[in-house]
Design a protein with these regions (language model features):
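Aliphatic-rich helix starts adjacent to a transmembrane/signal segment
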Residues: 27, 34-53
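A generic structural signal for short
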Residues: 14, 48-49, 61-63
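Low-complexity, acidic interaction segments enriched in glycine
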Residues: 54-134
Length: 134
């Protein structure tokens, strides 16, 4: 019986103060790590946005070189297999883009065609540049 009491006295748990100190340290670590994580995620989205716009612009150029005219939309680039699918804007999380139409210098008939794409996202990136200026 005394042996059991002695074992119970040696098996003490954490005190409330020790638990509070551990929680305080965790809160400090999270307050440092969370903004870094959020910045990294935002920077990754901006990088993907730039890459998606670059891929669309390259597809426009390749389409114009092959067909002798500009495409009329991003959907036409997908249908003609210059893009696998309509890219997603990682900021808005939609496949909608501002499709900039302009004079078709490639076509002998003239007319208008897709010359550029812009993001429809509001706001600015982490460097202060508006998403619409990408």
């Amino acid at each position: 019986m005394q042996n059991a009491k002695r074992k119970m006295q040696n098996c003490q748990g954490f005190s409330l103060l020790e638990l509070m100190i551990a929680m305080f340290i965790l809160i400090i670590l999270l307050s440092v790590a969370l903004p870094t994580y959020q910045y990294t995620v935002q920077h990754a989205r901006e990088t993907v946005l730039k890459e998606n716009i670059r891929q669309i612009e390259n597809a426009i150029d390749q389409y114009a070189a092959d067909k002798g005219k500009l495409p009329q939309s991003i959907d036409e680039l997908v249908e003609a297999k210059y893009l696998r699918e309509k890219p997603v804007d990682p900021i808005t999380e939609k496949t909608e883009w501002d499709q900039v139409m302009g004079d078709d210098a490639f076509s002998s008939e003239g007319g208008q065609g897709l010359v550029d794409v812009k993001s429809l996202a509001e706001g600015e990136d982490s460097d202060g540049k508006p998403y619409k200026d990408y």
